[in-house]
Amino acid sequence: MSYKINRKTYAQTYGPTKGDRVRLADTELIIEVEKDFTTYGDEVKFGGGKVIRDGMGQSQVTREDGAVDTVITNALIVDWWGIVKADVGLKDGKIYEIGKAGNPDIQDNINIIIGSSTEVIAGEGHILTAGSIDTHIHFICPQQIETALASGVTTMLGGGTGPATGTNATTCTPGAFHISRMIQSAEAFPVNLGFFGKGNSSNETNLFEQVNAGACGLKLHEDWGTTPSTINSCLNVADTLDVQVCIHTDTLNEAGFVEDTIAAIAGRTIHTFHTEGAGGGHAPDIIKICGENNVLPSSTNPTRPYTKNTLEEHLDMLMVCHHLDSKIPEDIAFAESRIRRETIAAEDILHDIGAFSIIASDSQAMGRVGEVITRTFQTAHKMKVQRGPLPEDSDRNDNYRVKRYISKVTINPAIAHGINRFVGSIEKGKIADLVLWKPSFFGVKPELVVKGGSIVWSQMGDANASIPTPGPVHGRPMFANYGQSLLKSSFTFLSKNAIELDIPNKLSLQKNCLAVENTRSINKLDLKLNNKLPNITVDPQTYEVFADGVLLSCEPLEEVPMAQKYFLL
């Protein structure tokens, strides 16, 4: 017997279906469900009197014969490849299948088998994204990691040794000793971690030593001297050992101009940090490098998006982070040379057209580690308000724009650093690093974070309450944060050479270590939905930025969404 249900009631029961639209947080961004993999009338849902019961939606199939460990039911997936409604099956800590869950004995077209060994996470009315990847971490304090996890970040790549003066300014873990100790410290944390060695050496032997010790990449930073010579030697080593090079270029143009840096890079793949320049880089025109096909350009979140407060807060941040002295005029001039309203405004638009590909934090070194996702979608909102729908979108939804922006914090940083085989998207076979959001809190506060197939973080009420929901409700660590579960649910990224040299055993590591790969043969065209290559020019007098001859300019935003109303404490 069939039963007809109206769309509103259906959405309230099973979540939105194809054609339904959802607002993201309090932004002007609207997404529309493109496809529904579930079957009307055959949906699975857990609860008293619901479907997932023995002989109904739950089959007799054992885990050994194919039942999954966990099913996330009726979730609205937002990923670079689509915005779809589906069940998601997890097994052995990985994404097993995306599609339709249930009991194949009584239901058709089941590709995710629910058995008595299957746990259920209710995804109805929730958005599911891949865990975000932050590739610009200054490992200044370990407390960053919990803050990042609480925001939906599950992978952190960067450098540092703690609150050392060098780490406060640069994302480098210099030398084999420090790399070893940081890799060992990663055993304590419930996220995926990887560490960059210091790339500033014209002696390649020093660089080989660091990558062989376990560095998953190398970082060139102007505070250590980013000269044409160090750029060349660093890229030579990276090409030999297949690791990524990240670069913070020469703000003062002491060793050359942006053209000299481009010449030293010589067409080799490189990840440029804070490519606009406020975070550092050739003044005033480092931004033009985003038009090079071998350059993987990223932003850091202090300039995301351009608001009325952006310029004012930057000077003090710069002075602290780069060990400058406000009593020295040259230090003030150095800081002021990096802060340009014209290039920051252009950065918004370059993100919106897909010319800038990645957004990261620059944690505690001008950036805020817990705001990567928030700042990304604040930028998307600002561009929607100021520029209207993208050509690929319509007045009905912002699907393409949302997919473009989610790519900047998930799949694109994964591709850039050679870890997309493992993380970065919701795709079969990848590690089950997933984030579940209430739409009203999207990009601000996750409802639940799954790490390696186990729940690692969740909104949770009073532990002494009779049910989970009484206040105070806030994000808290869950069981995958502890003991052996932590060690089995998260991973450490190393160079391929380090794994071949048996570094995990030499350092007595218990976490599984994964090798980065395919970092040298990629280019910007490999990045998803963010691979435009405009010809960028910068007026040296006015700092105005032009893309293919068109002036890129926008006004600062007076008020941003996803902000104070979500953070009352």
From Swiss-Prot:
Domain Urease: from-to ranges: 131-569
Pathway terms, separated by semicolons: Nitrogen metabolism; urea degradation; CO(2) and NH(3) from urea (urease route): step 1/1
Activity modulation notes: Inhibited by HgCl2 and acetohydroxyamic acid slightly by EDTA, but not by boric acid or L-methionine-DL-sulfoximine.
UniProt key word Hydrolase: yes
BP GO annotations: urea catabolic process
PROSITE patterns to which the protein is assigned, alphabetical: UREASE_2, UREASE_3
Name by which UniProt lists this protein: Urease subunit alpha
Lineage of source species: Bacteria, Bacillati, Cyanobacteriota, Cyanophyceae, Synechococcales
Gene symbol of the encoding locus: ureC
